[in-house]
């Protein structure tokens, strides 16, 4: 990918309040993530999410995060909220992801929780398998493995990411204003995803942290474009 024209996309995930969404939009977020997993502290009910999504301006994507949800549940959420992109973050198989996405006709990203023994070859195979299975596959989201679902708040070994898929991945896992510049400069991902790194409490965002995070990403973009 030509870094001279690349702008790292930014997703702020786990929003539950209108004021936090407006802060994220004002700071320049490209996508807003809503967690439809009832056991998450960042869970938002579909009717509440629908009210927030109705306030989104053009060209900002609403992403719905699901964990082991069945097709009927996803269909109901899509019908109620009009989310534009699905994010599968549980133990869904390749076939299940493809089938659910097809049932609602929405593109999807697949979260891969990277373990200490995950290899670069594993990541390449994941991408190949999902891309072969569905025309709606939009890319991998790489997060850190923890013994629970949803955001980890922890960083994994970025050196595992193969250079040839890095420009297509969404980088997640423990990102914050303190490491976002380094992450983008080293990995050059298509997008970054942050939740706990811009919070003052689970599900409650901090406007100063949002602004600092997005500024840190833009510092990296500017540095890459100057090379």
Swiss-Prot record:
GO terms for molecular function: phosphoribosylanthranilate isomerase activity. InterPro entries: Aldolase_TIM, PRAI_dom, RibuloseP-bd_barrel, TrpF_fam. Gene3D superfamilies: Aldolase class I. GO terms for biological process: L-tryptophan biosynthetic process. The keyword Isomerase applies. Its EC number is 5.3.1.24. The keyword Amino-acid biosynthesis applies. Pathway: Amino-acid biosynthesis; L-tryptophan biosynthesis; L-tryptophan from chorismate: step 3/5. Keywords: Amino-acid biosynthesis, Aromatic amino acid biosynthesis, Isomerase, Tryptophan biosynthesis. SUPFAM superfamilies: Ribulose-phoshate binding barrel. It catalyses: N-(5-phospho-beta-D-ribosyl)anthranilate = 1-(2-carboxyphenylamino)-1-deoxy-D-ribulose 5-phosphate. Belongs to the TrpF family. This is N-(5'-phosphoribosyl)anthranilate isomerase. It comes from Herminiimonas arsenicoxydans. The gene is trpF.
């Amino acid at each position: 990918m030509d870094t001279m024209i690349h702008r790292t996309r930014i997703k702020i995930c786990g929003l539950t309040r209108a004021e936090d969404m407006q802060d994220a939009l004002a700071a320049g977020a490209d996508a807003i993530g809503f967690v439809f997993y009832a056991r998450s502290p960042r869970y938002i009910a579909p009717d509440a999410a629908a009210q927030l999504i109705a306030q989104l301006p053009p060209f900002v994507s609403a992403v719905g995060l699901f964990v082991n949800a069945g097709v009927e549940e996803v269909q109901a959420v899509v019908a109620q909220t009009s989310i534009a992109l699905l994010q599968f973050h549980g133990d869904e198989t390749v076939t299940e992801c493809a089938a659910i996405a097809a049932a609602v006709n929405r593109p999807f990203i697949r979260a891969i929780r990277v373990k200490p023994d995950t290899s670069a070859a594993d990541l390449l195979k994941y991408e190949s398998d999902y891309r072969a299975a569905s025309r709606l596959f939009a890319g991998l989201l790489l997060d850190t493995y923890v013994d629970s679902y949803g955001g980890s708040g922890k960083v994994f070994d970025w050196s595992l990411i193969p250079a040839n898929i890095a420009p297509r991945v969404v980088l997640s896992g423990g990102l914050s204003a303190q490491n976002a510049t380094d992450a983008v400069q080293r990995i050059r991902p298509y997008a970054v995803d942050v939740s706990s790194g811009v919070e003052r409490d689970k599900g409650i965002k901090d406007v100063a942290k949002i602004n600092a995070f997005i500024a840190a990403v833009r510092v990296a973009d500017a540095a890459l474009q100057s090379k």
